[in-house]
């Protein structure tokens, strides 16, 4: 799959932040936070009795918003297996708003994704899908989920719900297997993968260390719970000058040779490495 290299899905997804759909007046603050992804929240952050109003407020606000293309504005709908999730989907499809992406929570099977893909296709919308992996059932079929639709641009790790589902404490070590499986599935599908937010707002150093662990594991970015976390996340997930220089060298050498593999600085470099280097350079170009 060459989606990272040739597709429109190559973009910076180093950080994301939620903003409540019930309060459109808060959207500008989230958009100005510096996060690469701004997610309008209709699910867990909205009380049941406010769901309808939040949906209506969000659609009305989206019809008026003018956005910088560098910001990926998405909407997290309610679980697609619930009444409010179905109402969310129907409202957005019938509104004609071509969202950059819809975030799908609590996905459990590829069939859910395929159904939503069909709905968006029938409505002639280009909307991508961000899929949250937060249940053990999803882990069991995660490779099929990740490949179930070309609309999927990213997987998100829902660590809080996953820990509850697995009956374990929400710690890095306890959830390492789940994180690793999600990273592998995303890599196999050629899509981005983002880690769960760090929940201790006052422990910036702890967040930084967990973000570094996530980056080293293969995550593209990490969520936030407050704008003050964004700067650090963007720094961690932005390729360093050394990484950029190395990536440029590999891409240039492949372009010159036209071969499928090369030896550069004594190391064998194959096409999968080239794709990752191209991804890094594309991200740097996007955030300049």
Predicted regions and their residues:
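Expand to "…catalyze enediolate/carbanion chemistry for C-C bond making/breaking, isomerization
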Residues: 1-288
């Amino acid at each position: 799959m060459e989606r990272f290299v040739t597709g429109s899905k190559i973009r910076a997804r180093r950080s994301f932040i939620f903003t409540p759909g019930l309060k459109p007046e808060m959207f500008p603050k989230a958009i100005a936070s510096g996060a690469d992804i701004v997610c309008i929240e209709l699910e867990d952050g909205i009380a049941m009795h406010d769901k309808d109003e939040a949906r209506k407020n969000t659609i009305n606000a989206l019809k008026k918003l003018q956005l910088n293309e560098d910001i990926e504005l998405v909407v997290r709908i309610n679980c697609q297996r619930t009444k409010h999730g179905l109402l969310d989907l129907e409202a957005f499809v019938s509104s004609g708003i071509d969202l950059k992406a819809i975030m799908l929570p609590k996905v459990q099977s590829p069939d859910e994704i395929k159904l939503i893909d069909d709905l968006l296709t029938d409505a002639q919308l280009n909307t991508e899908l961000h899929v949250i992996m937060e249940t053990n059932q999803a882990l069991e079929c995660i490779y099929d989920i990740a490949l179930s639709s070309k609309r999927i641009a990213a997987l998100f790790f829902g660590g809080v719900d996953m820990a509850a589902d697995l009956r374990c404490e929400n710690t890095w070590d306890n959830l390492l297997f789940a994180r690793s499986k999600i990273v592998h599935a995303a890599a196999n599908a050629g899509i981005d993968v983002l880690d769960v937010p760090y929940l201790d707002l006052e422990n910036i150093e702890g967040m930084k260390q967990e973000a570094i662990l996530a980056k080293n594991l293969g995550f593209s970015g990490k969520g936030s719970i407050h704008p003050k976390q964004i700067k650090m996340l963007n720094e961690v997930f932005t390729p360093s000058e050394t990484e950029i220089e190395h990536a440029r060298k590999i891409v240039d050498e492949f372009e010159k040779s036209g071969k499928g593999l090369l030896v550069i600085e004594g190391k064998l470099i194959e096409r999968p490495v080239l794709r990752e280097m191209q991804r890094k350079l594309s991200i740097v170009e996007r955030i300049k």
